[in-house]
Each structure stands twice: as C-alpha cells, then as structure tokens.
C-alpha cells in the first residue's frame, strides 16, 4: 500500500511554518497547473487521467481560473486582494485575518464579487473554506490544550493557515461518514461491513512520520478541482465513543492512497451557451482513504474532540463566533436576487407582469431578498472582536435555517411563473435551423421579444428550477448547513426566552390587574 504523500505533505513542520516560496494570490495558470498532480479521481467507472481536460470538470476549472485571473487584474485587484498586515505580502482577501470592522467590510465585498462572478451557484468556491480555517484560530489555545507527544495541534493549525494564505490555496472539506447504517448512534460512528472492516474514517496506526488512516468520508464538494482537503467532523458526528475515529487534518488532494469518486455529471450540455449555469457543476464526491499517511504537522485533532465540539457548538453552548463568514451569506443573497430577476424577466417576456397573482408571487420573492439583505446588515452590525483580537460577524445560524425553507419556495415560485415554458423551448441548434426557424419566429416569440431572447431566458430559468443542475442546487441548499432539524433544535436550546417566560408567569399569577377575580 502507498502511505506517503507528495510535496508539502511529506515536508517538515518547519517548511510549512516558513512557507518560503510565497506565491501570492492565485492565478488561473498556476491553479490549472496545480491540478495536474496525478490525483486519483474516478467518474462513471473510469479513472480520470487529467481533470483539467475531462469534459465533466474542465468547464468548472476554466471558470475558476477566469475568476482567479480577475482577482489579479483591474478593477478587482484592490477589492479581492490586499497587503497582509502580518507579512507585508499581497494575499487574497479570503485569507485576511479580520482585525477590525473595516476588515470585515473588505471581506464582505470580496465574497460579493466571488459570488457575483459565479452567479451565486458555487457552494464550495475558494472563498468558502478560508474563513473556516481562519476562525479555527480563534480556538487555537484550546486545540493546543489537547496534548500529544508528537505535535502541538494549535501550532499546526496556525502554520497551516499561514501556508494556505501565502499560496491562496483552494480547499474542499469532508465531514460526514458514509451513508451505510444511520440506525447506529451518531455518537458511535464505528460501523462494520463484511469482515469487520470499519467504514468511518479512523486511525489504523501511529508511526514516527504521522498517523495512517483508513475509511470513507462524504460529501466532499469540489474535491476533483481543489488543491487541499480539510477532513474533520460535523456537529452531528462530533462525539464518538471510539477515540480512534476522532481526528481532523488536511492533506493535498493528490495524496497517495486517497481515491475520489465523483457523482454522475448533472449537465448534458458541457460548455453550452444554451445552458449557461451548467458549466458551474462543482461536483460532489466520496473520499476513500486507503492507508493514507497524515504527517504529524498536518494534524489538528486526534482522539479528543473537545475543541471541535466547542467550535461547532455541539456542546449545546452555541457558537459565539460566525466561522462561515460572508461567503455563504453573499452566495445566498446572489442566488435569491438571480432567481427573482429571472422570474421578473420571464413575466415581462410573456406579458403577465401585471397579472395580480404573478405580481404577488414576484413580490413574495422580492420580500425574501429584502429580509435577507436586512439580516446581513444585522449580522454586520453585531460584529465585534473576540478575546484573541480577531473580529467576527454576529450569529447567522438562524439565517441558514430560514433559507433551507425559503430556497425551495423561491424555486417553486419561479416554476409557477414560467409555467409550461420552463420545459418547452427550442435549443440553440433549433434556432440555427433555416428550415424550422420561421416557425420559431412566429410561434415561440414573446411579448416584444424575439425567440432567441425568450428561449435563452427560459433555458436560464430551466437551469435554476427544472434541470438536474437546478435540483442538485436545491438539495445542496437544504443540506449544506447540516441537518435542518438538528440546527433548529440547537437554536432552540440556545434561544433566550427567560425574560418573556418570567413576564408570562407574573401575568398568570395576576390575570386581572385592574379588576377582581370572579
């Protein structure tokens, strides 16, 4: 079995700390070249020789490369990159450690741009995992408090942050266990299949170089085109009865022994102008670890989950800092506004914008957009410093719970406004056909718009609300923040009702303060 790691994974801890070859903000060319590392990616029964040229991945990779180049060019450079106060070197704002309200505003604008440029469709853009790693630094001392003779977990975390920041690396993550037998208690994720082979990721042995791990992890979105994979526990699985299943670490996506199984593509029209959003299929993957070596300096947690339980709020105390930052909030805002604008343009294109019931549906969608905007402003207003000096946004857990409900409703409204047009439109090849085009011009145009405009608009709506791509996005929005029911329960446990309960008890003691009881 292969147990080593290439490149940084086998480098010394000092090499990560020094990060001498600081490369600055990622560029498109550097990003694409970094993916040609022999990573073991599988899709539809075949091993992918090169993800940068495979039809299922190349459009997404090209789009990310385009955005990486934009962040290094005017007018985006000054908004998406900055000078790092710690090193004086230019870095991506995604990796900026926020030390003030102004830093948080800069990070908001950076996240807005990442999501505007990708139409709010990337749940795992490069801007997503950077705040996750940054915010773990808030608990650096607690990670360090868990002792191990081979390493300091808090120091490892800080060094890894510096390493990623200097290179502007694109991280994916994997938190959940394989969906094999959910009847097992979530605090005991040691499951068995066949000849007592354990399914959950676990430590097989310790060596002088690190720990060797085996098992499966899901669901790693964007794994085929990421550069690093952060592996940890979700709030659902944070408590374990078997300590060897308790670990958090990061490895290169091309690490030997790591197999990546991508799902079937959701798009039939790779690179098609006719379905513009489907090039943003970021893929979702299973990760299989076959005796993968994780060096000591890349471990952040081992055997003791206490810091991670605290970070995730799985101890019932609630999370006192918003570790997801702006990335998800801005993505949701862009997605909501896109769906509302498309629905409005569809209503205009078929002459129903003034219908009372249609206008009411559009107004409902606009209401959701405005509520979200005000909520984002509230999260920013509640921002403040942590004891470590790092600035954090106000709590946003309740917003993500709300959006799991609203997202499905907005998709439903878009479908209703489009009516049958969302499934019956001519293709680009139909539009190019000289024989059939006259019929399209006559029978498939809209109100004051030609058939090209109308069909392309409706196909955009189809991408959002009726295609395999759109359904995948809807499912992603429901689950990406974890089990919505668990999130609601955790919110209830930390929701302060003491004041109102006390007033109600007083009311029940004296129900008629200005009269007499009968």
Q: What do the PLM-derived regions correspond to, one by one?
A:
Residues 2-82:
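Acidic/polar, glycine-rich intrinsically disordered N-terminal extensions of enzymes
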Residues 48-115, 387, 477-480, 491:
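N-terminal low-complexity or amphipathic/hydrophobic leaders
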Residues 58, 62, 162-165, 334-337, ...:
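Generic structural signal for well-ordered, non-transmembrane alpha-helical segments
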Residues 82-228, 234-249, 254, 259, ...:
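Glycine-rich flavin
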Residues 178, 182-328, 496-517:
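FAD-binding core of flavoproteins
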Residues 324-384:
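Extended amphipathic alpha-helical segments enriched in small hydrophobics
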Residues 382-399:
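Short secondary-structure subsegments characteristic of cysteine-rich extracellular domains
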Residues 394-518:
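Alpha-helix capping/hinge segments and adjacent helical runs
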């Amino acid at each position: 079995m292969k147990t080593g790691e290439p490149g940084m994974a086998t480098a010394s801890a000092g090499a990560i700390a020094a990060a001498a070859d600081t490369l600055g903000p990622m560029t498109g060319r550097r990003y694409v070249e970094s993916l040609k590392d022999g990573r073991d990616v599988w899709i539809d029964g075949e091993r992918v020789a090169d993800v940068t040229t495979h039809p299922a991945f190349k459009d997404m990779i090209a789009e990310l490369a385009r955005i990486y180049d934009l962040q290094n060019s005017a007018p985006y450079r000054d908004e998406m990159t900055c000078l790092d106060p710690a090193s004086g070197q230019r870095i991506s704002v995604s990796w900026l450690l926020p030390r003030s309200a102004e830093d948080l505003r800069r990070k908001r604008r950076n996240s807005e741009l990442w999501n505007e440029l990708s139409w709010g469709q990337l749940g795992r853009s490069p801007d997503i995992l950077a705040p996750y790693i940054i915010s773990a630094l808030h608990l650096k001392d607690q990670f360090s408090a868990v002792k191990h003779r081979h390493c300091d977990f808090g120091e490892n975390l800080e060094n890894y942050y510096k390493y990623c920041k200097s290179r502007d690396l694109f991280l994916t993550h994997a938190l959940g266990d394989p969906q094999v037998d959910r009847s097992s208690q979530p605090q005991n994720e040691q499951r068995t299949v066949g000849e007592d082979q354990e399914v959950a990721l676990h430590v097989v042995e310790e060596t002088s170089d690190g720990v060797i791990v085996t098992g499966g992890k899901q669901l790693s979105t964007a794994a085929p085109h990421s550069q690093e994979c952060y592996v940890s526990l979700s709030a659902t699985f944070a408590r374990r009865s078997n300590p060897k299943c308790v670990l958090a670490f990061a490895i290169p996506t091309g690490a030997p022994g790591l197999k990546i199984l991508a799902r079937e593509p959701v798009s039939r029209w790779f690179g098609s102008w006719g379905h513009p959003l489907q090039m943003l299929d970021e893929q979702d993957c299973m990760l299989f670890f076959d005796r993968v070596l994780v060096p000591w300096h890349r471990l952040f947690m081992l055997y003791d989950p206490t810091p991670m339980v605290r970070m995730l709020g799985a101890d019932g105390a609630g999370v006192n800092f918003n570790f997801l930052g702006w990335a998800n909030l801005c993505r949701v805002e862009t997605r909501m506004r896109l769906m509302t604008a498309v629905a409005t343009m569809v209503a205009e294109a078929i002459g129903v914008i003034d219908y009372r019931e249609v206008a009411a549906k559009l107004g409902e969608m606009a209401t959701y957009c405005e509520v979200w905007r005000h909520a984002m402003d509230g999260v920013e207003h509640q921002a403040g410093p942590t004891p470590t000096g790092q600035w954090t946004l106000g709590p946003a857990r309740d917003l993500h719970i709300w959006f799991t409900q609203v997202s499905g409703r907005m998709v439903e409204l878009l479908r209703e406004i489009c009516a049958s047009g969302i499934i019956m439109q001519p293709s680009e090849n139909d539009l190019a056909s000289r024989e059939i085009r006259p019929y399209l011009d006559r029978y498939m145009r809209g109100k004051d718009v030609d058939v090209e405009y109308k069909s392309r608009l409706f196909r955009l709506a189809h991408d959002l609300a009726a295609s395999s791509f759109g359904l995948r996005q809807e499912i992603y929005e429901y689950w990406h923040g974890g089990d919505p029911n668990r999130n609601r329960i955790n919110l209830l446990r930390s929701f302060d009702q003491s004041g109102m309960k006390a007033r109600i008890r007083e009311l029940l003691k004296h129900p008629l303060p200005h009269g007499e009881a009968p």
